Regions:
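Residues that form or flank phosphate/diphosphate-binding pockets in enzymes
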Residues: 84
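Intrinsic-disorder/low-complexity signature in envelope-associated proteins
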Residues: 1, 5-8, 13-38, 48, ...
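Conserved "boundary/linchpin" sites in short secondary-structure elements
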Residues: 17-26, 40-48, 64-78, 87-101, ...
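Short, small/polar residue-rich loop motifs at catalytic or cofactor-binding pockets
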Residues: 54-60
Length: 122
């Protein structure tokens, strides 16, 4: 099996959320912009902002998308400490899955993407 590309990630999408900002970072070797936009849009569509929001913090989740588009893994990298915000971010990624199958040209079993859910500073 070939080695995975370096974990340096490239920003593909940055959008405003109610009360904050959403960023999606994909492995740079994964250059299918249409797929990236579609995957990020699915997460954003599944986002349900909580009533209470922490100030000036962010949740960072690292997802592994399998060849068939299923969520092969999801782990937290950084949490705000505000359970409602962190849980809403996790739920958005889980509800967005499954994603479209990875392109046949992608020569790895999974693709990594980091989803950032930032709370606006007040």
């Amino acid at each position: 099996m070939p080695d995975m590309p370096a974990a340096i990630l490239g920003l593909i999408l940055s959008l405003l959320l109610p009360g904050g900002r959403f960023n999606a970072y994909f492995t740079p070797a994964f250059t299918d912009a249409a797929y990236q936009k579609e995957a990020a849009a699915k997460v954003l569509k599944a986002w349900k902002p909580p009533a209470s929001q922490p100030t000036g913090k962010k949740t960072v989740l690292i997802a592994q998308i399998a060849k068939d588009g299923t969520l092969a893994g999801l782990r937290d990298h950084l949490m705000t400490g505000a359970k409602s915000w962190d849980d809403a971010a996790i739920a958005a990624v889980r509800h967005a899955a499954p994603f479209a199958p990875l392109p046949k040209s992608w020569g790895f079993p999974t693709m990594e993407v980091h989803f950032h859910f930032e709370v606006a500073a007040k």
